[in-house]
From Swiss-Prot:
It catalyses: N(6)-[(R)-S(8)-aminomethyldihydrolipoyl]-L-lysyl-[protein] + (6S)-5,6,7,8-tetrahydrofolate = N(6)-[(R)-dihydrolipoyl]-L-lysyl-[protein] + (6R)-5,10-methylene-5,6,7,8-tetrahydrofolate + NH4(+). The gene is GCV1. InterPro entries: GCS_T, GCST_C, GCV_T_N, GcvT/YgfZ/DmdA, GcvT/YgfZ_C, TrmE/GcvT_dom1. This is Aminomethyltransferase, mitochondrial. Substrate binds at residues 221, 250, 397. Its EC number is 2.1.2.10. The keyword Transferase applies. It comes from Saccharomyces cerevisiae (strain ATCC 204508 / S288c).
Length: 400
């Protein structure tokens, strides 16, 4: 049975935006739903949710992620700006490398999670943020730049470009034949996880390719001009190991990989420490005496990190018995079925783990250790779960 039936979307709105691939999705039998202000495919005709999920894990899947906000930060003080609004050390980031980070409000809460890549030695950074946060992120960047009016840097949205994600163990085999062998640029075997470089297609068109993604598999995210996006997608899909994949599988894939979804695992009330994202807080930025080098929410975040003053932590879990999946907002209890100790943020059956139910949650400090057995309450019944280390399935990133 397809588990897509468990996913609920808002009523379709005729004012939704469309990506450059919208008509292609429809022609491929995509079931279009509203998502983050866009009309996006959740499934494709002839593929169940589980089939799409498993295909990506074993072959290659094409995801349209053009709804994501692509932007650029430039100027002599770009690094200083990033050092204030994120806890990550961008002084140490090599050219052509990117990293996951978080945008922080003054209280240390997560405004959005983001991938930020250093494009060159001229302090230019490529930034990808969530579509559902686009309006708030735009206000955030503008407000923070005004607050730092002495900083010489500019932020602007990149217009006219699509973003395609190729994910799965055979993604490289599909992409490589479409790239020019004569134009200057790195070979894909020299592009490692987290890196992004410019490549040329066989027709001479330039694309920016980053190695990574949102599934836990090896893969690529390709920024390409809108007018070239459909032709490029069709060329990718001409390979029989590549199939179009929708939002349903994208969500279950990221859940297995232990990745956050903004609005579920992350929001402005959650700090990176509570979200178990300590690794985005660079060690070089943890013991700063001079406050002029502090990032937003520094005092609170460092207190949580050093003194464990947080009250809850993001965790992964697996069901110990069959039952309905625990969705966002489901309560978590101690084995006595009386003491509430947490809330589920995301949950689904896991196709990779023989469809056992898995999820992520926030659990009170002291009950958050791997192996802890708790209960979730679904439809007035209790089901036993065990907290598990994330990712919940092995990842296969292409690293040096």
């Amino acid at each position: 049975m397809s588990i897509i039936k468990k996913i609920v979307f808002k009523r379709f709105n005729s004012t939704l935006k469309k990506t450059a691939l919208h008509d292609l999705h429809v022609s491929l039998g995509g079931t279009m739903v509203p998502y983050a202000g866009y009309s996006m495919p959740v499934l494709y005709k002839g593929q169940t949710h589980i089939e799409s999920h498993n295909w990506t894990r074993t072959n290659a899947g094409l995801f349209d992620v053009s709804h994501m906000l692509q932007s650029k930060l430039s100027g002599p003080h770009s690094v200083k700006f990033l050092q204030r609004v994120t806890p990550t050390d961008f002084n140490a980031l090599p050219v052509g490398s990117g990293t996951l980070s978080v945008l922080l409000n003054p209280q240390g809460g997560v405004v959005d999670d983001t991938i930020i890549t250093k494009e060159n030695d001229d302090n230019e950074f490529y930034i990808v943020t969530n579509a559902g946060c686009a309006e708030r992120d735009t206000e955030f960047f503008h407000d923070e730049l005004q607050n730092g009016s002495t900083l010489d840097c500019q932020w602007k949205i990149i217009e006219g470009r699509s973003l395609l994600a190729l994910q799965g163990p055979k993604a490289k085999d599909v992409l490589e034949p479409l790239l020019s062998k004569t134009a200057p640029g790195k070979d894909l075997k020299e592009l490692f996880f987290g890196q992004r470089h410019e490549f040329a297609l066989k027709d001479g068109s330039l694309v920016q390719i980053a190695r990574g993604g949102y599934t836990g598999e090896d893969g690529f995210e390709i920024s390409i001009a809108n007018e070239k996006a459909v032709e490029f997608a069709e060329q990718l899909l001409a390979n029989p190991v590549m199939k179009p994949i929708g939002l349903a599988a994208r969500d279950s894939l990221r859940l297995e990989a232990g990745m956050c979804l903004y609005g579920h695992e992350l929001d402005e009330s959650i700090t990176p420490v509570e979200a178990a994202l300590n690794w985005v807080i660079s060690k070089s930025r943890r013991d700063l005496v001079d406050q002029k080098y502090w990032f937003n929410g520094y005092a609170k975040i460092m207190d949580q990190l050093n003194n464990k003053t947080y009250s809850k932590v993001r965790v992964g879990f697996k069901y110990l018995k069959k039952g309905p999946a625990a969705r966002n907002g489901v309560k978590i209890f101690l084995p006595d079925a009386e003491t509430e100790v947490g809330l589920v943020t995301s949950g689904s059956a896991s196709p990779t783990l023989n469809n056992i139910n898995i999820g992520q949650a926030y659990v009170q400090k002291g009950y958050h250790k791997k192996g802890t057995k708790l209960l979730v309450q679904v439809r007035n019944k209790f089901y036993p779960i065990e907290l598990a280390k994330m990712p919940l399935v092995p990842t296969h990133y292409y690293k040096q």
